[in-house]
């Protein structure tokens, strides 16, 4: 094959009407690419969607703030410190030798198991991890879940 000395675009410049694209109108507007923009994504360009943008359709994005609820948590170590502070101020509620901490009234949803428990606590909680429950009971404390309280008061 003969090597082309100049570019095709330079050769065609200024002297041809169709610039090597056949009949007038071929390659002129958006018909050659199947329409402008996102046209045909559910029709003739669907294979492109499957290959390059599989998440194009469907719901994505933000959830309403009113629907999102993040658990507010507290560790047993922090509860122990809080109990010590309340006891030293004389504001602690004591039942059967245990300092009562109602985490639901404090605004916490869940009690986690990080930290040490050094005194007997009676913890009322909405949710609690196994580790936290074990640590509180090993220190001579007691755990009461809110469900148990509500079930007990209903009967």
Curated annotation (Swiss-Prot):
Keyword Heme: no
Annotated keywords: Ribonucleoprotein, Ribosomal protein, RNA-binding, rRNA-binding
Presence of the UniProt keyword Ribosomal protein in the record: yes
A single GO BP: translation
One MF term in the entry's GO annotations: rRNA binding
Matching InterPro entries: Rbsml_uL15_N (IPR027386), Ribosomal_uL15 (IPR030878), Ribosomal_uL15/eL18 (IPR021131), Ribosomal_uL15/eL18_sf (IPR036227), Ribosomal_uL15_CS (IPR001196)
Disulphide bridges, residue numbers: none
Domain of life: Archaea
GO cellular component, one term: cytosolic large ribosomal subunit
Subunit structure and binding partners: Part of the 50S ribosomal subunit.
PANTHER family: 60S RIBOSOMAL PROTEIN L27A, LARGE RIBOSOMAL SUBUNIT PROTEIN UL15
Family as reported in the entry's similarity comment: Belongs to the universal ribosomal protein uL15 family.
Function recorded in the entry: Binds to the 23S rRNA.
UniProt name for this protein: Large ribosomal subunit protein uL15
């Amino acid at each position: 094959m003969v090597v082309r000395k100049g570019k095709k675009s330079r050769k065609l410049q200024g002297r041809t009407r169709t610039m090597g694209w056949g009949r007038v109108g071929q390659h002129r507007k958006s018909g050659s690419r199947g329409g402008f923009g996102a046209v045909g994504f559910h029709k003739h360009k669907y294979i492109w969607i499957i290959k390059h943008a599989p998440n194009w359709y469907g719901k994505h994005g933000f959830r309403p703030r009113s629907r999102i609820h993040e658990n507010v948590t507290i560790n047993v170590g922090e509860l122990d410190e809080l109990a010590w502070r309340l006891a030293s101020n004389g504001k602690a509620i004591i039942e059967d030798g245990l300092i009562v901490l109602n985490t639901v009234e404090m605004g916490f949803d869940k009690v986690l198991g990080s930290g040490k428990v050094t005194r007997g606590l009676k913890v009322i909680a909405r949710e609690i991890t196994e580790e936290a429950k074990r640590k509180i009971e090993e220190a001579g404390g007691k755990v009461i879940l809110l469900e148990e309280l509500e079930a007990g008061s209903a009967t």
